[in-house]
Amino acid sequence: MKYSTIFSAAAAVFAGSAAAVGVSGSAEGFAEGVTGGGDATPVYPDTIDELVSYLGDDEARVIVLTKTFDFTDSEGTTTGTGCAPWGTASACQVAIDQDDWCENYEPDAPSISVEYYNAGVLGITVTSNKSLIGEGSSGAIKGKGLRIVSGAENIIIQNIAVTDINPKYVWGGDAITLDDCDLVWIDHVTTARIGRQHYVLGTSADNRVSLTNNYIDGVSDYSATCDGYHYWGIYLDGDADLVTMKGNYIYHTSGRSPKVQDNTLLHCVNNYFYDISGHAFEIGEGGYVLAEGNVFQNVDTVLETYEGAAFTVPSTTAGEVCSTYLGRDCVINGFGSSGTFSEDSTSFLSDFEGKNIASASAYTSVASSVVANAGQGNL
């Protein structure tokens, strides 16, 4: 009887622990309603092969990471000739000659020998109906990114880190790639020391995406600006994309934070942009940006290229126009030792009608809240 009681108690503890494993909270903004793997029984990969298999199969899954999965040297290395468009100083990134990029785009750049890890160049495929979550602060993928592409939908990535993807090399790999996907929520993810983009949404439609509470850490030994500030931050380049960015910490970058173009509607709300040595926004043709309640601190140039349209709520009174389209007023942004961001185009705000819209808080509490809550381990 005693052993039976002990066993029953242990089983109850295990069952309670298993039941507690899952996604925390729910998506806000365009990806509202995403369920990922739903109530599927959690699986705990132990090897990189198991992780790849779980992420890429046809099953609805809740995949829990309890350690670092290091892909760095899992596919060997390639040695070849690249180029150095930004110089040959020790802090400068150099470029892999992917698809003859050096010859086609930087023909005057000096050639240079490159050696990079093959695993980083192409990320792990994530198929539909997946929740990928980290346990505490321990779930990480090193040396390889994630790809949500080719019609994948209903995916949640939460509370993990993606790091150390050929940081010296442009075209060495992206942390998280989306292209031709729908209903994707990426939340409390830390990305650091990446060769190319921390986030890239490709040229096909990426419908209903929410990027929330993420930490884009731009500190790196190598950068295209040769100053330790990573240039390739967030690139939103899809066709008919709907993207919510809320509560993210964009830190120590020098450009593309974000770059928005090609029929992308971005709601950028309550993010903290801090210590950006170059520029934050590029808004190319077809980029439509509503920016409200953000804080820009020590951002030299908030907006560099402006060929699309943006409404940045230049005054409290100006923000009243949003009530017609969002059902509430928009809130002003905050600035400290930063450039200006006072665009007042409202012609595209009607595109928000009928969609799931993230709430907005006053900018005054954003910096402290984002620093405390963004990234892995801060659920």
UniProtKB/Swiss-Prot annotation:
It is found in: Secreted. Residues 1-20 form the signal peptide. It catalyses: Eliminative cleavage of (1->4)-alpha-D-galacturonan methyl ester to give oligosaccharides with 4-deoxy-6-O-methyl-alpha-D-galact-4-enuronosyl groups at their non-reducing ends. Glycans are attached at N129. One of its GO terms (molecular function) is pectate lyase activity. InterPro entries: Pec_lyase, Pectin_lyas_fold, Pectin_lyase_fold/virulence, PEL. SMART domains: Amb_all. The keyword DNA repair does not apply. Its main location: secreted. Disulfide bonds join C83-C102, C92-C226, C322-C330. Its EC number is 4.2.2.10. Keywords: Carbohydrate metabolism, Cell wall biogenesis/degradation, Disulfide bond, Glycoprotein, Lyase, Polysaccharide degradation, Secreted, Signal. The active site is at R256. GO terms for biological process: cell wall organization; pectin catabolic process. One of its GO terms (cellular component) is extracellular region. Belongs to the polysaccharide lyase 1 family. Pectinolytic enzymes consist of four classes of enzymes: pectin lyase, polygalacturonase, pectin methylesterase and rhamnogalacturonase. Among pectinolytic enzymes, pectin lyase is the most important in depolymerization of pectin, since it cleaves internal glycosidic bonds of highly methylated pectins. This is Probable pectin lyase A. It comes from Aspergillus niger (strain ATCC MYA-4892 / CBS 513.88 / FGSC A1513). The gene is pelA.
